């Protein structure tokens, strides 16, 4: 599903104009992005948590040459689905066979 698909879904289900639906979806994504950039956790009840984690620098190895290289510190984004979402996914697997 793309952002355009999400906008279309909001347009169809809520009854806003396509322009209004697009603005709302953009605002939601902007808010999520800004919150994560500040390093804050996002908790969406019944869906899951987006968490920014700090990774320390470490020594790694180039798989082609075997040479040791320094991997710099960085921030990574993780997602932990809620139990509600996990259960919904498992139920939908029972109803619809995977393609």
Swiss-Prot record:
Example GO biological process:
DNA recombination
On the tree of life, the source organism's domain of life is: Bacteria
GO MF term list: DNA binding; structural constituent of chromatin
User: An example Gene Ontology cellular component term from the record?
Assistant: cytosol
Keywords assigned by UniProt?
DNA recombination, DNA-binding, Transcription, Transcription regulation, Translation regulation
Q: Looking at the Swiss-Prot or TrEMBL record, what is one Pfam family this protein matches?
A: Bac_DNA_binding
What is said about its interaction partners and assembly?
Heterodimer of an alpha and a beta chain.
Q: What's the family?
A: Belongs to the bacterial histone-like protein family.
**Function noted in UniProt:** This protein is one of the two subunits of integration host factor, a specific DNA-binding protein that functions in genetic recombination as well as in transcriptional and translational control.
**Stated name of the protein:** Integration host factor subunit alpha
Per the UniProt record, the lineage of the source organism begins with: Bacteria, Pseudomonadati, Myxococcota, Myxococcia, Myxococcales
